């Protein structure tokens, strides 16, 4: 019986140590919830909002950034794809059907092997086959208007003329059901979740530790300050935090309503 | 008292096991018939994609009757809503399914692995005519027998849980896999038959031709068990990398295609190796428990030897396991870069830091047990001075493996370190450093084993000095090669070469293990023994290393099982069948590890209870033997 108890105590202690380590010593990152299905008001969409939708799809639902980033080197960077698209059409290796830059970018998303940038093909295929998934099917499942939004985003990013047309008709019921990307957030908590503020800040129940704690920020800062801190984060640096940590583009990412909701929320957090 | 008198004959409990197994078999046998919709009154809100999209029947549709008939037999994956998932007050369906599946898997891994090495040990016993091997093989299989019925119980619980909480999912899977489920049920029956004949016929088939028949039954038991696992693996991997269905999840009619999906073979290999390592560790824990409870030096000697053998099996399988895991991960990337990056670069990345701690614990405890084992030999004094250096290298490698890529820090810490990445420690966080560390750790663990193996021997061959020199040269060359590959290709070239160089690192490690083992076996053939090995002369603390090994293995399996399943994210079947249940979210690491810990506590409680029962029944048997 003594051995039995000793062994039980030892085993439980080991298990509890692992549980403690995983809970207390490892940062608890809250994964994004499954995509929410929401309705989209396409009738009143402006080109700025459409580009914004493309930005959000690129960094969110499209999961493009997983590979097209400067860290991993897994896929070519797309900052200038709006510019180089026309040049690719003249490349002797190009075997697609596109006639314009816009068509080339669309084709590269729905038929990735039409042209593979040198060095980024599937191993052993001599860059004839792309490892990229078709973005309109499978786990990504972008709708045609979302593909167009991403093209508009690329063109705007490269500084070329935006040739994509805004969607003229309301999307089908199925489109509406799935298009969650550009839906404006309905509450400050949704804004926090949508833009991942909690990854760095303590806010709305999230426990980020890289940036200042915002749970009582309203007691110290007024709305003007808070608005500026979102739009131009390097304008004022909180003591003890290095400059340049916060992405500077929330000013163009957040919709006006979302920004105001967030600022109100922070101002009331006392 | 002879050890053979400890053998417990359990006819009444055998009947109970048989009844449980028969019940499970009957249950599994009926499962494929659940394909029929009337078995599933729950989930009436389910809308199948084809039904939703199907227009009213037209003459042309009638003309296409034959092609449509195919779609009627194999419906697309249903589009479920929250209300299609039955709720039972006070019970969370996902946690219930999670724990039932995990407990089933732990016990199943154990009962599939033990017959593999029991077969090998029995064959060694036959070849060497050393009865100790036969006794030990019998005791191993005895331990797994109780676990066999518990495996069946948890398997049944899992199926019931799926019927109650995920009826539409089960219906969809049964719609595709029903022939394999039927085969599974038959094979389960065959496995039970093989196991019971193998175990209960052990003493009746001890001599002559009967022994050969017995060994053949052991071989059949392994074949049937392995095929069983491969079938279950097909279901699991289909959920991760579906094949043989179209984009809507409509089965295209070729059973081999859905079985032979992209991740089937990598998982098959990984699970076979991991099961052996795991089975060895649990049997090692059993031997440790018996060692600690032993009252005579003869018992201590027997269970020391059993623990050593079990640990040897566990470590032998542990060494190639990272390579099988590497292949599996590479295939996940090859199937879907998204899934691969979710696994290694997304929210799951931190789980690999926990994995590093666990594998570090496995390696350290295994090495510690080997070092303690040197006390059995008087010749070990020649090598004990090297242990501290080996320990230093292994701990150093563990720390590299353990270094995270990005640290979550307080603002003060962030400022002090100069940004999110430390100047010197930052580079240790990426895979090339970790690949280098794990390969060196494996090589030094192998070195520990080699020292242990030769500590009681003196080579008598004329070329012993040359052999030693060659071995040292192979070790040195491999370590330099691994380090250079890791540093140069890891930091000074692009990603493609980083990945490719890891293959050469693995090849270096395998070269060391295989070539040095061959040289060692030849060099110590006919070697002189320093003194007889003193089995049983082990400190009690060494036995806790075996427990640490078993508990860490169990926890690690639970964690990795969670990751394997969770990288599907909000999909029942990745990309074709979405999970719309209220529990479709990916939990935080803390949440997941709490569930894993609860599962491990339940598992260990049952296992230790089985050991304790074995102790009680053994005492009874001893008492009867004295009478």
Question: Where in the sequence are the language-model features?
Answer:
Chain B
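Coil-to-alpha-helix initiation sites in intrinsically disordered, low-complexity, charged segments
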Residues: 1-2, 41, 90, 254
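Hydrophobic secretory-pathway targeting helix
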Residues: 2-42, 485-489, 557-558
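Intrinsically disordered low-complexity regions specifically enriched for long asparagine
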Residues: 12-21, 43-51, 70-71, 101
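Sec-dependent signal peptide cleavage junction
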Residues: 33, 37-56, 60
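Polytopic transmembrane helical bundles with strong interfacial aromatic enrichment
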Residues: 50-51, 56-627
């Amino acid at each position: 019986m003594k051995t039995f108890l000793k062994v039980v105590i030892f085993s439980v202690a080991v298990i509890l140590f692992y549980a403690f380590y995983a809970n207390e010593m490892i940062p608890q990152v809250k994964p994004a919830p499954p995509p929410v299905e929401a309705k989209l008001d396409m009738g009143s969409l402006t080109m700025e909002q459409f580009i914004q939708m493309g930005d959000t799809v690129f960094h969110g639902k499209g999961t493009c950034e997983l590979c097209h980033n400067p860290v991993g080197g897994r896929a070519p960077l797309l900052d200038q794809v709006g510019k180089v698209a026309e040049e690719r059409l003249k490349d002797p290796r190009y075997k697609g059907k596109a006639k314009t830059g816009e068509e080339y970018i669309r084709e590269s998303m729905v038929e990735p092997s039409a042209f593979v940038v040198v060095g980024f093909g599937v191993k052993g295929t001599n860059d004839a086959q792309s490892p990229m998934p078709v973005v309109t099917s499978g786990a990504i499942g972008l709708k045609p208007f979302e593909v167009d939004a991403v093209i508009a985003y690329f063109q705007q990013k490269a500084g070329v003329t935006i040739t994509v047309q805004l969607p003229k008709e309301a999307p089908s019921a199925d489109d509406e059901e799935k298009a969650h990307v550009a839906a404006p957030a309905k509450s400050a908590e949704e804004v926090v979740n949508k833009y991942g503020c909690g990854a760095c800040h303590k806010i709305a129940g999230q426990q980020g530790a890289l940036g200042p704690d915002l749970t009582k920020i309203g007691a110290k800062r007024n709305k003007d300050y808070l608005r500026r801190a979102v739009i131009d984060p390097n304008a004022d640096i909180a003591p003890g935090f290095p400059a340049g940590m916060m992405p500077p583009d929330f000013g163009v990412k957040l919709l006006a309503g979302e920004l105001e909701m967030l600022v109100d929320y922070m101002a009331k957090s006392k | 008292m002879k050890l053979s008198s400890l053998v417990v004959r359990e006819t009444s409990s055998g009947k109970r096991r048989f009844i449980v197994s028969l019940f499970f078999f009957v249950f599994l046998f009926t499962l494929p018939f659940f394909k029929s919709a009337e078995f599933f009154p729950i989930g009436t809100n389910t809308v199948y994609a084809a039904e939703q999209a199907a227009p009213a029947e037209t003459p042309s549709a009638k003309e296409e009757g034959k092609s449509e008939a195919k779609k009627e037999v194999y419906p697309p994956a249903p589009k479920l809503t929250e209300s299609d998932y039955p709720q039972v007050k006070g019970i969370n369906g996902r946690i219930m399914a999670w724990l039932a599946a995990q407990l089933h898997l732990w016990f199943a891994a154990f009962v599939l692995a033990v017959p593999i090495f029991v077969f090998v040990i029995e064959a060694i016993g036959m070849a060497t005519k050393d009865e100790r091997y036969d006794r030990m093989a019998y005791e191993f299989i005895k331990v797994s027998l109780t676990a066999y019925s518990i495996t069946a119980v948890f398997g049944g619980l899992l199926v019931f849980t799926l019927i109650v909480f995920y009826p539409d999912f089960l219906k969809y899977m049964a719609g595709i896999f029903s022939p394999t489920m039927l085969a599974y049920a038959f094979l389960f029956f065959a496995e039970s038959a093989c196991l019971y004949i193998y175990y209960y016929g052990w003493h009746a088939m001890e001599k002559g031709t009967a022994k050969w028949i017995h060994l053949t039954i052991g071989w059949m038991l392994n074949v049937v068990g392995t095929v069983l696992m491969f079938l279950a693996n097909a279901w699991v991997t289909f959920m991760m990398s579906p094949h043989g269905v179209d984009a809507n999840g409509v089965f295209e009619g070729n059973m081999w295609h859905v079985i032979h999906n992209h991740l089937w073979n990598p998982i098959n290999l990984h699970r076979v190796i991991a099961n052996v390592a795991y089975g060895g560790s649990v049997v090692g824990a059993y031997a440790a428990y018996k060692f600690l409870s032993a009252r005579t030096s003869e018992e201590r000697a027997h269970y020391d030897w059993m623990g050593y053998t079990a640990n040897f099996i566990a470590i032998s399988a542990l060494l190639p396991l990272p390579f099988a895991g590497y292949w599996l991960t590479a295939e996940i990337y090859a199937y879907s870069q998204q899934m691969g990056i979710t696994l290694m670069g997304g929210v799951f990345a931190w789980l690999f830091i926990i994995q590093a701690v666990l594998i570090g614990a496995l390696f350290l405890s295994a090495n510690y047990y080997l070092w303690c084992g040197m006390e059995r030999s008087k010749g070990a004094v020649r090598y004990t001075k090297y242990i501290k250096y080996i320990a230093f290298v292994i701990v150093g490698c563990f720390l590299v493996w353990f270094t995270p890529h990005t640290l979550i820090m307080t603002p003060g810490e962030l400022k002090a370190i100069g940004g999110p990445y430390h100047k010197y420690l930052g580079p240790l966080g990426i895979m090339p450093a970790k690949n280098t560390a794990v390969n060196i750790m494996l090589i030094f663990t192998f070195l520990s084993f080699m020292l242990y193996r030769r500590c009681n021997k003196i080579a008598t061959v004329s070329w012993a000095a040359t052999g030693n020199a060659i071995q040292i040269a192979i070790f040195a060359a491999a370590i330099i090669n691994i380090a250079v590959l890791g540093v140069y290709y890891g930091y000074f070239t692009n990603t493609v070469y980083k990945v490719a160089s890891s293959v050469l690192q693995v090849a270096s490690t395998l070269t060391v293990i295989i070539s040095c083992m061959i040289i060692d076996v030849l060099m110590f053939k006919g070697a002189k023994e320093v003194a007889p090995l003193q089995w049983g002369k082990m400190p009690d603390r060494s036995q806790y290393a075996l427990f640490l090994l078993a508990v860490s293995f169990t926890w690690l399996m639970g964690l990795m099982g969670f990751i394997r399943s969770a990288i599907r994210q909000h999909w029942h079947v990745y990309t074709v069948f979405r999970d719309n249940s209220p529990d479709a979210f990916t939990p935080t690491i803390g949440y997941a590890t709490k569930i894993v810990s609860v599962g491990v506590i339940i598992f260990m409680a049952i296992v230790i209870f089985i050991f304790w029962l074995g102790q009680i029944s053994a005492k009874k048997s001893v008492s009867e033997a004295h009478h």
